[in-house]
Amino acid sequence: MERAEKREFVTELNEVFKASGSVVVAHYAGSTVAQMNDFRSKMRAAGGTVKVAKNRLAKIALQGTEAEGMSNLFKGQTLIAYSNDPITAPKVVMDFAKTNDKIVVLGGAMGTTTLNAEAVKSLATLPSLDELRAKLLGMIQTPATRIVGVVAAPASQLARVFAAYAKKDEAA
């Protein structure tokens, strides 16, 4: 890499660390190209990105960001997985690590909080923001449908009473 390319890469990585909802750092030593391509495609499908960076450049890019506390994670062959959704990157990394023992989660960051490997695992078990929104919307809609049912019930009961009187009058 030329010096200008390194500067550009550090600037790009710095923006990633500033703007991402969550960042996960993991070792990938021993993974095949096919496995890494599979991992990248799964992360892309979920809305995240995977980058492999030189540790020295990643540490420089971390300077001045909220995630600066995770600079000690960059030792050995490390990859950086990130997403705007705080849950996506940890979830995809942990799911992939279950089937591929070459991926070892070291930790990560979410905003100003530096996460260890256990915290990343815990974060991966949470539902995504879209799932939480769907649950919240369902909880909000449930009382409304019950109110509609309660309001509509007397009208339907009244209609049944009229129908019963009409049948009674016809029979008489």
Curated annotation (Swiss-Prot):
Family listed: Belongs to the universal ribosomal protein uL10 family.
Protein keywords: Ribonucleoprotein, Ribosomal protein, RNA-binding, rRNA-binding
Function field: Forms part of the ribosomal stalk, playing a central role in the interaction of the ribosome with GTP-bound translation factors.
SUPFAM superfamilies, per database record: Ribosomal protein L10-like
Tagged with keyword 4Fe-4S: no
Record-linked Pfam families: Ribosomal_L10
Gene3D superfamilies: 3.30.70.1730, 6.10.250.290
Quaternary structure, from the entry: Part of the ribosomal stalk of the 50S ribosomal subunit. The N-terminus interacts with L11 and the large rRNA to form the base of the stalk. The C-terminus forms an elongated spine to which L12 dimers bind in a sequential fashion forming a multimeric L10(L12)X complex.
Species of the source: Rhizobium etli (strain CIAT 652)
Protein name listed in UniProt: Large ribosomal subunit protein uL10
Record-linked NCBIfam families: PRK00099.1-1
GO biological process entries: translation
Top-level lineage group: Bacteria
A GO CC term attached to the entry: ribonucleoprotein complex
Keyword Lipid metabolism (UniProt): no
Molecular function terms from GO: large ribosomal subunit rRNA binding
